[in-house]
C-alpha cells in the first residue's frame, strides 16, 4: 500500500505540474486511444514482481541511454497512462513512478511476465513513432476505421522495432527527439496536455464508459474490421465476439444494420429470403419469404391431392412476372419436385405456390424466375387447364361448387369448350390477339385416366377421318360460328363446367388447346394454323361437291350420247342463273385477292380448253367469252367463301385435280353453242 500511495502522490504532482501548461479542455480523447489504453493496461503490471512495471524493451532502451532520458515526454505519458486507473483497481496494483521500474528491471523480470502476453505498450509506442499523438490530434473523429487502416498499430511486432521507432521519430517530429530529448519541450508539452485531459476524463467518467473493461471485453481490431480472421488465433487476448457488440454510431448505417425490413440500397437482399435447413419436408425443399412473404391459404376442401398427380420432369420453362400477385385466399398450385429443387438452389428469389400434404402454402411476392407454374383447380377430373407459355395474369380459385373455373379480368380468351378445329390448330382464340400459341408447350397436365383414354380414342378417330379424306360433320359450322358462351370473354369472369361429349367428332372440356404431355398426339403439332385445317378438311368436300354437280351433268350427257335435251338443260340452268350470276359477279368484284387470283387462274385453264374449238372455228368471239365467263362463275359459285385456295401452289394443285371435270363442262357448253 505504500507503493500505491507513493504512486498516487506522484500522479497528482505531475498533474499539477502539467496543468501550468496550456491545458485545453475542449480536446476530446478519441475512441481509438481509449481502446488502446484499455487494451494495454493488463500488461503493464505484474503481480508476481510486487506490482512494478518491468518490461524487456524498457530495460534494453534504458541501458542503451540513447533513446530517452528520465524527463522525456514519452516516459511521462506512459507513466501517466499507466497511472490513470479506476478506483476499483488502484488498491490491487501499484502506481510506482518510472524510476523504480528502471532501477529494478532486470533479467528476473524478463521471464516473469504474464503468460500469453504480447510485448508491452512502450514497445508498441516506439513502434508507432513519436507522431502518433499528433496524428490523432489532427483528425476530426475517430472510430473503428482508424484502427483498421493503420497496420502499425498492431500489438505484435518484430524484434527490429528499435530501428523503426528511431526512423518514425525522426520523420515526424521537428527535432530528432532520440538525439536531443531534453530540447523537445513542445512535444512534451503537447503530449502532457493530451494525457492530462485523458486522465481527467477517465477519473470523472467523462467518456460515458464508467467502469473499467477487462481485456476479454475489448474487441479484437482484426475482427472489428469485418474480416472474421485474427492472425493470433486462439492466443489473442481480446474478444472475438464482435458481432454481438454494438458498433460505433458513425458506422451504424454502413454495415451494421441487419434489419429484415431495411433495404438501404434500394434492392432486394438475401435477408428477405430465409433458407430453411429443416424445410426438407417429404423430399421438398421449402424456401419462404421472411415475415411477410409467406401466407397459408386454407382452401375449402383442399385436401391432400398432390400425391395423386403425375409429375413430369421436363416442364420447367421460363415464366414472366405476373402483373398481379395470386390471391392468398383459396388459391392452390402445384410445383414439380424436380423443378422446385432446381430453382431453390439458385441465388434468385423463388416465388410461387406449392402444396405439401393438406397444407397449401403460397409465396406472396411473385417475381420472375426460372420456375414453372401449373395453376390448376381442385375440380372434377373432367375440367382442367394449363398455364400458357406467356404467363397470362389469370388466377384459379375454388368456388362454392368446387368444380368450376374462374379466369380473371383482362385474361385472354381461352376457348375452354372448343371444338375440333380449335384443338387441332393449337391456337388460343382471343379478342386482343396478344398471346397466340403456335406450337404445343410442355406443361404439367392434371387429367384423369378416363379422360386420357377418351382423348386417345378421339385422336385415333380424327386420324382416321383425316387419312380417309372424309368430310367431318359439323366442322364447317364450327369454323364459321363465332366463339360463344363456351369461351371466357376477356372483360368478364365466367364460370363453366363442361362435360365430355359422347360424340367423337367434338372435343369438350379440354381446357386450353395448347397440347399437353398427358394428351397423346392431339394433332396440334401437325397442323400449324386454321387455314390449313380448313383446306385439308374442306377441300375434299369442295371437290366432291363440284365433282358431283359436274359429273352428274356430264354422265347424263354421256348416257344420252349427244342428246340435245340434256345439253340444253345444262345450258338452261346456266341461263336461268344469269341474273344471279350478275349479282355474283358484283360480289366477286368485292372479293379479296385470294378469290381474284383463283379466278384468273381458272380463266386461263378454261381458255386453254377452248383453244381447239376456237381454232376449228366452232366458236365465235362472243360465244368464246360467254363460255369462259359461265364456267368461271359456275366453279366459283360452288365454292364456299372460306374454302378458296389462297397461294399459287394450292391454286395450281386444285386446278390440276379438277381439270377433267372442267374439260367436260367446257365441252358441254361448246356443244350447246353449236346447236344454237
UniProtKB/Swiss-Prot annotation:
Region Disordered: what ranges?
1-134, 172-217, 245-307, 487-506, 533-594
Compositionally biased region (Acidic residues):
563-583
Can you tell me where the transmembrane regions are? Answer: none
Keyword entries, A-Z: DNA-binding, Metal-binding, Zinc, Zinc-finger
Q: Which InterPro entries does the UniProt entry name for this protein?
A: Zinc_finger_CCCH (IPR052650), Znf_CCCH (IPR000571)
Q: Does the keyword Manganese apply?
A: no
Q: Which GO terms describe its molecular function?
A: DNA binding; zinc ion binding
Q: Does the keyword DNA-binding apply?
A: yes
Quote the biased-composition stretches of kind Basic and acidic residues, using this chain's numbering.
12-21, 101-110, 124-134, 192-212, 269-278, 538-562, 584-594
Disulfide-linked positions:
none
Zn fingers (C3H1-type): where? 214-243
For bias type Low complexity, the affected ranges are 251-262
- Per UniProt, the ranges with Polar residues bias are 58-79
Q: What is this protein called?
A: Zinc finger CCCH domain-containing protein 38
Amino acid at each position: 500500500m505504500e507503493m500505491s500511495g507513493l504512486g498516487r502522490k506522484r500522479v497528482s504532482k505531475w498533474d499539477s505540474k502539467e496543468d501550468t501548461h496550456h491545458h485545453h479542455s475542449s480536446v476530446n480523447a478519441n475512441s481509438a486511444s481509449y481502446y488502446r489504453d484499455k487494451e494495454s493496461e493488463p500488461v503493464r503490471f505484474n503481480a508476481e514482481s510486487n506490482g512494478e512495471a518491468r518490461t524487456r524493451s524498457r530495460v534494453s532502451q534504458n541501458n542503451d541511454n540513447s533513446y530517452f532520458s528520465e524527463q522525456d515526454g514519452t516516459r511521462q505519458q506512459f507513466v501517466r497512462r499507466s497511472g490513470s486507473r479506476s478506483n476499483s483497481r488502484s488498491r490491487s496494483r501499484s502506481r510506482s513512478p518510472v524510476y523504480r521500474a528502471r532501477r529494478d528491471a532486470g533479467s528476473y523480470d524478463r521471464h516473469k511476465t504474464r503468460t500469453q502476453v504480447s510485448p508491452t505498450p512502450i514497445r508498441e509506442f516506439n513502434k508507432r513513432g513519436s507522431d502518433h499523438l499528433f496524428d490523432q490530434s489532427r483528425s476530426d473523429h475517430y472510430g473503428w476505421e482508424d484502427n483498421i487502416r493503420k497496420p502499425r498499430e498492431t500489438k505484435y511486432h518484430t524484434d527490429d522495432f528499435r530501428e523503426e521507432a528511431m526512423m518514425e521519430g525522426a520523420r515526424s517530429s521537428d527535432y530528432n527527439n532520440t538525439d536531443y530529448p531534453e530540447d523537445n519541450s513542445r512535444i512534451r508539452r503537447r503530449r502532457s496536455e493530451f494525457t492530462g485531459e485523458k486522465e481527467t476524463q477517465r477519473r470523472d467518467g467523462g467518456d460515458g464508459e464508467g467502469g473499467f473493461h477487462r481485456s476479454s471485453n475489448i474487441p479484437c481490431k482484426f475482427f472489428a474490421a469485418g474480416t472474421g480472421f485474427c492472425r493470433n488465433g486462439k492466443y489473442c487476448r481480446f474478444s472475438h465476439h464482435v458481432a454481438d457488440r454494438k458498433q460505433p454510431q458513425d458506422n451504424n448505417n454502413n454495415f451494421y444494420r441487419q434489419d429484415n425490413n431495411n433495404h438501404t440500397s434500394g434492392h432486394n437482399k438475401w435477408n428477405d429470403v430465409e433458407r430453411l435447413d429443416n424445410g426438407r419436408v417429404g423430399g421438398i425443399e421449402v424456401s419462404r419469404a421472411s415475415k411477410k412473404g409467406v401466407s397459408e391459404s386454407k382452401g375449402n376442401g383442399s385436401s391432400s391431392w398432390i400425391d395423386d398427380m403425375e409429375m413430369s420432369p421436363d416442364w420447367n420453362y421460363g415464366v414472366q412476372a405476373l402483373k398481379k400477385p395470386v390471391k392468398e385466399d383459396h388459391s392452390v398450385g402445384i410445383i414439380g419436385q424436380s423443378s422446385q429443387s432446381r430453382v431453390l438452389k439458385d441465388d434468385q428469389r423463388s416465388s410461387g405456390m406449392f402444396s405439401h400434404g393438406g397444407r397449401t402454402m403460397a409465396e406472396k411476392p411473385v417475381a420472375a424466375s426460372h420456375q414453372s407454374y401449373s395453376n390448376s383447380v381442385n375440380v372434377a377430373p373432367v375440367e382442367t387447364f394449363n398455364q400458357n407459355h406467356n404467363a397470362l395474369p389469370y388466377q384459379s380459385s375454388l368456388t362454392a361448387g368446387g368444380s368450376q373455373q374462374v379466369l380473371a379480368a383482362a385474361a385472354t380468351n381461352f376457348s375452354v369448350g372448343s371444338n375440333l378445329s380449335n384443338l387441332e390448330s393449337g391456337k388460343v382464340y382471343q379478342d386482343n390477339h396478344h398471346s397466340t400459341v403456335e406450337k404445343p408447350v410442355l406443361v404439367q397436365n392434371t387429367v384423369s385416366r378416363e379422360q386420357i383414354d377418351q382423348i386417345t380414342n378421339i385422336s385415333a378417330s380424327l386420324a382416321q377421318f383425316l387419312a380417309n379424306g372424309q368430310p367431318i360433320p359439323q366442322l364447317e359450322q364450327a369454323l364459321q360460328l363465332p366463339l360463344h358462351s363456351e369461351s371466357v370473354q376477356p372483360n368478364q369472369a365466367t364460370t363453366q363446367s363442361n362435360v365430355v361429349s359422347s360424340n367423337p367428332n367434338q372435343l369438350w372440356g379440354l381446357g386450353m388447346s395448347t397440347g399437353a404431355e398427358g394428351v397423346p398426339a392431339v394433332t396440334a403439332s401437325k397442323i400449324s394454323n386454321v387455314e390449313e385445317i380448313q383446306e385439308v378438311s374442306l377441300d375434299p368436300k369442295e371437290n366432291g361437291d363440284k365433282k358431283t354437280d359436274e359429273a352428274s351433268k356430264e354422265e347424263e350427257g354421256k348416257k344420252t350420247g349427244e342428246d340435245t335435251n340434256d345439253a340444253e338443260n345444262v345450258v338452261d340452268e346456266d341461263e336461268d342463273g344469269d341474273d344471279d350470276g350478275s349479282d355474283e359477279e358484283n360480289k366477286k368484284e368485292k372479293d379479296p385477292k385470294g378469290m381474284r387470283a383463283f379466278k384468273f387462274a381458272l380463266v386461263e385453264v378454261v381458255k386453254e380448253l377452248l383453244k381447239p374449238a376456237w381454232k376449228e372455228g366452232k366458236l365465235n368471239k362472243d360465244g368464246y367469252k360467254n363460255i369462259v365467263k359461265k364456267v368461271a362463275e359456275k366453279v366459283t359459285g360452288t365454292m364456299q367463301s372460306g374454302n378458296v385456295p389462297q397461294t399459287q401452289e394450292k391454286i395450281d394443285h386444285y386446278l390440276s385435280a379438277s381439270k377433267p371435270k372442267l374439260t367436260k363442262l367446257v365441252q358441254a357448253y361448246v356443244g350447246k353453242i353449236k346447236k344454237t
